[in-house]
């Protein structure tokens, strides 16, 4: 009881001296607030002492007590602030304002209303101090007139105070269990619990309002005394980090860093940033460029650094150095550009500096923004109220807040440039895609033309690979017409393939009769193949299957040796005098006397489906003028006429194997030696009663093959000399 009264009387004495009617003693007020913050005095007793002092009738004492209370509220810690926001203290103030007895002094009343308004404004958003706001709103509703509002941040009520003690069963440094012999002790700096071995050191803690030496653990002692040299022990470093984490989790005001290197460095950086913001033309943070040139000064500054703040300071210094280098490079670029412009336009106009965007942020402003962001991010991990003890941060915040319109305009221009860039990139991508497609199309076209160049397909042949390849050499240097008669002997021919579909007739497959020699030609001059004459229906595209021919008795067979054909000497004399089929165009247009109006033409189906090839040299295409089809009469089949005229003429560039039947003598000039395996083809169906020596006057089938020589003998003027020579052979 005596101790309690003695402590209360000690605080009361200090309060009486601080609130005397004389001038305000600021130093004594701060001492009282340090006692409250260090928890040397219970916060409730301090609140009651101030409440009793307000009962004094002297207005000066009341005003001094209100000022002392405001100082203790701003520096006494959250535990004392909770007592001030209690109903006991606030209701006492309201009762003083609403008393009906002795009226309250006007100055005291105004001061009281001002403090209530400031405390309520600073306590917004804090649930433990909500009664301050309720009292303020109640007084407003009752009609009290408050002075103009002052914008006060809630951090003004924050202050550093000793943390709350944490209980544990083991030492939080060496993990040794506590026992009857191993007592637990609390560190006054961090609030953690340690044994006697880990907390045997004592230090005063002025940043917490503790001026006398108190017990601290080894980690806090190393941190507080390592301002001149960094801790060399790894365990101390880990313990220091553990204490910092524990203290941050406790959400208590920060520890012994009021006089640490972080505050000094932060204050110095803020001061330099403000100077740069005010003086836009300055060269920036000059001392940062001299760090490498002054190692002694750097070492001195490093001695005052704290370990956890080294990274932040290094980042700030690096950013300042980068900004300085960027400014130098920019200035050099401006000078070079100005010099180049001056040299090029010296005769016309003076050199003008590059146009600068008025909304572009200067390097100093950009650096201030980055510095403020780094500081805010760093202070987020600090206890509440730390930012308020540094007025330079508030000034930096105000200077950066003025840059918001400028930053918004710059951001808008950057976004428009970005959109333009995206549009141009999309257009460029489209153009490149179209260009690649064009290149691919041209490349494929070039490949197709290159592949076609290796084997040229004839223009009029729908089936270019239908016939086998024929040798191109001509034996003994004889002409194409003579090669038909100087080749190997004609062997048996293979039967043709039964194909019911016709193929287009080539112009060079049609061998037209030339001008017949004068005088009759004997039918016995050429031996015709002996074969049966089947009944052939009219040409309608459905040809019957070709059967193997049976030899006929009255027919004269082919000779087995080539002696039956004209010899070389006779043929040379005879066929050299024979007119060329294309020399007389009138030979195709008008028939001769005694001939029928229908000219016999070999069937295109017979020539297309023929698998015969010459045993010797192939028939070489004549390089003369194109051959013309002879006119046909009404007796020819209309289907055959339409089919023969509807297909293109085959190109003469490729030799075509042919089977030339033994027909009228003019067609015998072009008879071709055939391969060995062969069979006769169907012939024309002869009209009953038709005289020998004339063509049939009825339907002429295009697939008709040569029949007996008398069927195809043509009445024409003869040449006796040639006939006699052939008969002799």
From Swiss-Prot:
Query: What is a GO molecular function of this protein?
Result: zinc ion binding
Which residue intervals define the domain VHS in the entry? 16-147
Which residue stretches does the UniProt record annotate as biased composition, category Polar residues? 279-290, 497-507, 520-534, 626-639, 671-688
Put simply, this protein is called: Vacuolar protein sorting-associated protein 27
Which Gene Ontology cellular component annotation is one that this UniProt entry carries? endosome membrane
Q: Zn finger regions (FYVE-type) covering which residues?
A: 165-225
Q: What is known of its domains?
A: The FYVE domain is involved in the binding to phosphatidylinositol 3-phosphate (PtdIns(3)P) which is required for the association to endosomal membranes.
Q: What does this protein do?
A: Component of the ESCRT-0 complex which is the sorting receptor for ubiquitinated cargo proteins at the multivesicular body (MVB) and recruits ESCRT-I to the MVB outer membrane.
Q: Which family does it belong to?
A: Belongs to the VPS27 family.
Q: Identify the residues that the record assigns to the UIM domain, covering every copy.
A: 261-280, 307-326
Q: Which InterPro entries match?
A: ENTH_VHS, HGS/VPS27, UIM_dom, VHS_dom, Vps27_GAT-like, Znf_FYVE, Znf_FYVE-rel, Znf_FYVE_PHD
Instruction: Quote the CDD domains the UniProt record gives.
Output: FYVE_spVPS27p_like (cd15735), GAT_Vps27 (cd21385), VHS_Vps27 (cd16979)
Stretches with biased composition (Pro residues):
551-560
The UniProt entry's GO biological process terms, in alphabetical order, are: protein targeting to vacuole; protein transport to vacuole involved in ubiquitin-dependent protein catabolic process via the multivesicular body sorting pathway
Q: Pfam families, per this entry?
A: FYVE, UIM, VHS, Vps27_GAT-like
- Localization, UniProt: Endosome membrane
Low complexity: compositionally biased ranges: 333-352, 650-661
